[in-house]
């Protein structure tokens, strides 16, 4: 399992490549008292999420307050669908949309092309 090493390497890269002060990694679950103290959250293995109704409510509140969620570590269509269904519970009024290669966000620091995206079936 890559946790917590992958998380730590990811946040170290953010610190190294941007002007964002990341601070020390802080691992916790949704609902932990520290949850709303972080404006940016990196969640891994969300294809295994089984969020309770309370966790769904808290994640919704977090996002609607302006919190930023980055997710990672999907293995195939089944895990993607688990995450998608979870997010439908969190934000039922919103749809997920794919970010195209031409979107400016794909070219802020690096030029990310479709060929660079990693998808594991």
Task: Describe the role of every protein-language-model region.
Residues 1-40, 44-48:
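Aromatic-Pro/Gly-enriched surface loop or interdomain linker
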Residues 20-30, 71-76, 94-102:
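Surface-exposed patches in mature extracellular/periplasmic domains of secreted proteins
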Residues 5-13, 54, 58, 78, ...:
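Extracytoplasmic/secreted proteins, especially bacterial periplasmic and envelope-associated proteins
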Residues 15-19, 64, 88-92:
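Sec-exported extracytoplasmic/periplasmic mature domains
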Residues 78-121:
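An acidic, glycine-rich "communication" segment
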Residues 40-80:
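Short alpha-beta junction capping motif
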Residues 26, 30, 57-59, 85, ...:
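Generic preference for flexible, low-structure residues
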């Amino acid at each position: 399992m890559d946790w917590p090493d992958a998380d730590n390497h990811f946040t170290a890269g953010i610190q190294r490549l941007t002007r964002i002060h990341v601070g020390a990694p802080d691992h916790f679950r949704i609902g932990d008292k520290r949850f709303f103290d972080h404006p940016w959250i990196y969640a891994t293995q969300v294809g295994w999420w089984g969020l309770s109704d309370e966790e769904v409510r808290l994640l919704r509140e977090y996002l609607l307050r302006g919190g930023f969620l980055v997710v990672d570590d999907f293995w195939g269509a089944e895990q993607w669908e688990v995450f998608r269904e979870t997010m439908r519970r969190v934000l039922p009024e919103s749809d997920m949309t794919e970010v195209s290669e031409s979107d400016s966000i794909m070219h802020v620091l690096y030029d990310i092309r479709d060929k660079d995206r990693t998808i594991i079936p």
